[in-house]
Amino acid sequence: MIVYLAGPITGVADYRQRFYMAERKLTDLGYTVLNPAILPEGMSKAAYMRICMAMIESADVVTFMPGWQNSAGARIEADYCFYTGRKTYALELVLLGDVEKTEKTANDEREQVG
């Protein structure tokens, strides 16, 4: 299963380490991970978002790291997933077991907010 890893990047000093650790944990569970933190620095926000949307489209599911609600980019990704019907899961729950058995999703949170 291909998993896109969504979460806060801008303004987070150790984002690469956080994303790498999450990627490693997911990989150890057998997932193929699309990690946006590997993208090079120096591009525009629009360029990053275009690449990330393509990554999301290539993934089977999107998993959201802690603090994603505080990231403008991750909120855009969550909205995109919500409106296009993509499966989304909180990272903590994916790490607990089979993603197909997970009930609490980013879409659940998005629906509660409106």
Indicate residue ranges for each PLM-predicted region.
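Conserved catalytic or regulatory cores that recognize and/or transform ribose-phosphate-containing ligands
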Residues: 1-114
